[in-house]
């Protein structure tokens, strides 16, 4: 997977965290540095950790599924993308009354938003991916997206949440199709 594909993948994976960060910003009248760090570190950290775990799960089973690896990557990325698109169309409201930045809440949200990254990590085991670069980009880009989301969310509100998830879903599906086409026609 080339550098630009990793950038697009990182942005797509960060869209769930971006959407949740928008919601987080609605619960605070004034954001402080600690809010940015809490949200960025939790989401960026878990988005980087989960593909690593997924990668090692994938290589454990690599010999069993090497001949269908491109189909696995395509199916996983497409299913994740479709899930994100479906969620973007459901119009869920953000909860602005809960304790939004506590350990349990942030841990649960970080894990929930990074499950997609775990599945992508499994597909990394079957692709030509620089794992360290991918993990770095996914973590940093998610961190940056969360910071941007907190800023934007304070200004523009819930309207943007669904658009971010929709875009992220479309990007994942496009990457899945690209991987499938490369392996079917150019290997």
Swiss-Prot record:
Organism: Campylobacter jejuni subsp. doylei (strain ATCC BAA-1458 / RM4099 / 269.97)
Entry annotated with the keyword Manganese: yes
Gene: mntP
Membrane topology reported for the UniProt record: Multi-pass membrane protein
Keyword Cell membrane in record: yes
Family annotation (PANTHER family): MANGANESE EFFLUX PUMP MNTP-RELATED
InterPro entries documented for this protein: Mntp/YtaF (IPR003810), Put_MntP (IPR022929)
Similarity field: Belongs to the MntP (TC 9.B.29) family.
Protein's cellular compartments: Cell inner membrane
CC per GO annotation: plasma membrane
GO molecular function terms listed in the Swiss-Prot or TrEMBL record: manganese ion transmembrane transporter activity
Name used for this protein in its record: Putative manganese efflux pump MntP
